[in-house]
Amino acid sequence: MTIFPKTLMLLGSGELGKEVAIAGKRLGCKVIACDRYEEAPAMQVADLAIVLDMNNHNSLQKTIRDYKPDVVIPEIEALAVEALKDIEKEGINVIPNARATAITMNRDQIRNLAAEKLAIKTANYGYASNIEELKEVSKKVGFPLLVKPVMSSSGKGQSLIKDKNDLEKAWDLAIKEARGDSKQVIIEEYINFDLEITLLTIKQSNHQTIFCPPIGHEQKGGDYQCSWQPQKLSFDQLKEAKSIAKKVTNELGGIGLFGVEFFIRGEEVIFSELSPRPHDTGLVTLISQNLNEFELHLRAILGLPIPSIECVSPSASRVILSQESFAKVAYKGIEKALEIQNSKIMIFGKPNTKKGRRMGVSLAQGKTLEEARFKADKSAKCIQIFEAKEAQS
């Protein structure tokens, strides 16, 4: 039987980490929220906030050793993963495990694991370490294609390229936006898909793997814009998606919730990416499911039962993006947004913003997916983001 309270350390304290922290507090856990900047969203609901450079091996290792949490929960990719491997050897539980965290932060490693080791269908791809290699690989992959940094997150540094004339610009952007010292890009065939989905996959300590109903989503520049649930798939499509998700997560090992992304093209199910943590497209589960993805993640981590996962209503989400950069932020239109029946607004509480930064999300239920998506879109459009002093004048 699990003894509470547990101490959870979040590595990354953004909006997803905030919901993990809230789920943890509801179970009586102590939450330590870490990030590179003050007043990050999860810090606002945690017992303790720590600002540090999580890419610094010694700093990250010392922080974990000093506080000795029961569980370390990475929420972002930008981490000194070698430090996590050392900590894991000392008996501290890293979720899902240090190896999975390392593999999934690098597009080349997770792609090689899926396509080469596990023989899973993916887009055609190749790698380049300089502009000349990029030009050569592009000839083999064929246009249109995508150029992405091997290490980045939230679509940063991605370009859709239709011909060779834009390759140098794509290279420059990818290297500029790459995380860490990586100077490598992945070149991917552009899949003319019918649909993109996320299959939230939960690996439990009892060795069972369970799934949430599929989530449909749209991205722009590789970054989530809206999502909806449940997304209908054929019997064969869902069976294949579950089979692939289970195969990849079994290879990675560990416990917790994984966000596994797929392209759907006709009856084809094509593996895209994987995150070993709650997924941004899964924010819709805060209104669509009996247990949201953050609660499911923690139940799996802490060895707690998950009797069932049910979709309670057709539901949708739409991100609320800032159009400008502000040192301090204020909002208008929340009253208008909340006039929409069966809708919610979540403001993440980020202390400042820049153009295109995700500052909140609207959530809505409907009798149909179409109604839910319409309401979520309408609600999000109500929210205006201002510089704080301007909004308060």
Swiss-Prot record:
Assembly description: Homodimer.
An example molecular function term from Gene Ontology annotations: magnesium ion binding
| Top-level taxonomic group | Bacteria
EC identifiers of the protein: 6.3.1.21
Q: Name one GO cellular component term.
A: cytosol
Its gene name is purT
* KW Magnesium (keyword) present: yes
Q: Give residues annotated as binding Mg(2+).
A: 261, 273
Q: By what name is this protein known?
A: Formate-dependent phosphoribosylglycinamide formyltransferase
A Pfam family the protein falls into: PurT_C
* Protein family per UniProt: Belongs to the PurK/PurT family.
- HAMAP family hit by this protein: PurT
